């Protein structure tokens, strides 16, 4: 069965867990300012074909959903989601 209530209910993909264990002891200056985030920004720019694009990382799904919804939807538009979807259950009133 597929569950859409929250991504916190599932474990991560084995490849992600493996990579996290490889870099677990690396020291980084802070979220968004390290070499891994800089590499990710460049990959996102390349995938979008926008080498000069500004790329920002947000710390959570609620903040990310709020930014995207505010940016893309007009005041009279809404989000269609599964009744058990995170945006419908855990973010009600937050966005």
Locations of regions flagged by a protein language model:
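Buried hydrophobic packing segments
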Residues: 64-72
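Active-site-proximal loop->helix
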Residues: 90-94
């Amino acid at each position: 069965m597929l569950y859409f209530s929250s991504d916190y209910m599932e474990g991560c993909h084995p490849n992600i867990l493996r990579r996290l264990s490889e870099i677990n002891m690396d020291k980084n200056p802070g979220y968004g300012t390290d070499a891994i985030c800089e590499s990710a920004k460049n990959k996102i720019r390349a995938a979008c074909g926008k080498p000069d694009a500004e790329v920002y990382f947000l710390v959570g799904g609620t903040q990310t959903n709020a930014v995207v919804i505010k940016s893309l939807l007009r005041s009279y538009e809404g989000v269609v989601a599964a009744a058990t979807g995170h945006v419908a259950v855990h973010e009600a009133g937050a966005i």
